[in-house]
Amino acid sequence: MNKGQYFWNELWCEGRISFHKEEVNPDLIAYVSSLNIPAKGRVLVPLCGKSVDMLWLVRQGYHVVGIELVEKAILQFVQEHQITVRENTIGQAKQYFTDNLNLWVTDIFALNSALIEPVDAIYDRAALVALPKKLRPAYVDICLKWLKPGGSILLKTLQYNQEKVQGPPYSVSPEEIALSYQQCAKIELLKSQKRIQEPNDHLFNLGISEVNDYVWCIRKG
């Protein structure tokens, strides 16, 4: 287990998961239509944790594929929502699945890409910003390989003064987004908003009082 894997496993084991939200993300509800997902389309949720957004997407009629490093997160997800799953193990990857939900427990960078069928859309609420800068290019490449031509990504990022603190969540500038996805057909900024950090926010406790939130729709050519 490398340093990054140990870090995330420790957070889940100790219950330090302030990044997990109990409510469906309002930006997903507001902007999911911009993805133009076909009926019964496949949606990838990378670094999914136990996000309730996955359940919301399933209830909209989509097939959700989640990838998560920490098995405890997936086990909590299926237990908390009383989901009856089947199990499978392929190499180092463990799979929990139903007819419309496919959850992989593995390092996304080590997952055999052939195990993920092409998806119609990707929903990234907190995956890109969870990764240090040196890993983000590889992450983008992997996700784009899984995305069908013409498919779209709903991506949430944030930006703050990195001189004060390093993430996660990491600050990702609009310039980095433009560079990272320059091979795509369209990069559209759907939302840009300043947000004052509340005392229970992780970044507030690290000395960050204000962040810029961004929501992007990125379409693959």
Curated annotation (Swiss-Prot):
UniProt keyword S-adenosyl-L-methionine, yes or no: yes
EC number(s) stated in the UniProt entry for this protein: 2.1.1.67
Keyword Cytoplasm included in the entry's annotation: yes
One annotated GO molecular function: thiopurine S-methyltransferase activity
GO CC terms, sorted: cytoplasm
Location in or out of the cell: Cytoplasm
Annotated binding of S-adenosyl-L-methionine, by residue: 12, 47, 68, 125
Listed GO biological process terms: methylation; response to metal ion
Reaction it catalyzes: S-adenosyl-L-methionine + a thiopurine = S-adenosyl-L-homocysteine + a thiopurine S-methylether
PROSITE patterns cross-referenced by the UniProt entry: SAM_MT_TPMT
The entry's keywords: Cytoplasm, Methyltransferase, S-adenosyl-L-methionine, Transferase
Family per similarity comment: Belongs to the class I-like SAM-binding methyltransferase superfamily. TPMT family.
NCBIfam families linked to this entry: PRK13255.1, TMPT_Se_Te
UniProt-recorded name of the protein: Thiopurine S-methyltransferase
Organism from which the protein derives: Legionella pneumophila (strain Paris)
Lineage of producing organism: Bacteria, Pseudomonadati, Pseudomonadota, Gammaproteobacteria, Legionellales
Gene that specifies this protein: tpm
